[in-house]
Amino acid sequence: MPINLTHHFLIAMPSLMDDTFSKSVVYMCEHSERGALGLVINKPSAMSMKALFEKVDLPLGREDLSATPVFQGGPVHTERGFVLHEALRSHSVVGPSDPSPSSPSSPLGEPGEPGSAQAAPSLSADEPDDSPLESSIYASTLTIPGGLEMTTSRDVLEALSTGAGPKRVLISLGYAAWAQGQLESEIAENSWLTVDADPAVIFDTPIEKRYDKALSLLGLESWMISPGAGHA
């Protein structure tokens, strides 16, 4: 039976040595028979959210996010922003939020080159989702079973610029992608551990502790794993 790693963490094994994925934790936004898409959640860039908003000519109306780094989400489309946030409900929105979305940015799923140089899958944020969650108020959003959403349209930034928007947010430039069967092969080759995702690791855990915290979800510590040790 095919595995579905949507709303899971991939935890890099020590054998994965490249700069992008070494000691990385990847939050899986979508996984299907066509491929997989995720965001690295523990590789901050040198850019702060405040600097990013200045770059796109928007103020940042959320002082709590001003010094938060923008993350290096993966090697595909590193010029584009991807906003991971709680699924929007009345309790997860700060301040007033305009329910009328602006025009969406380019959708996810355009062909790209992940770290392994294989083509990225054609995944779309606009495709139907089996989750019972209500639709996001934003124009281009992938609703992820497990209570999170990934938005690629500018309207989420506009909401944050007014002091509104999701309470908990991670913004990345770029994403990680795997072609059909590629991720399954990498797991079989012992490149990754997998575990159900816990949003607290993404939003409530210091960046430098996220790798160890994700491992702890499996009852492991970093000293307990080594190249070729097997995966959970």
Where are these regions (language model features)?
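Short, low-complexity, intrinsically disordered N-terminal modules
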Residues: 105-108, 122
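Short Gly/Ser/Thr- and charged-rich N-terminal loops/segments
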Residues: 104, 113, 117-118
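Residue-identity detector for glycine
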Residues: 95, 109-115
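A short aromatic-anchored loop/beta-hairpin motif
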Residues: 1-98, 119-171, 176-232
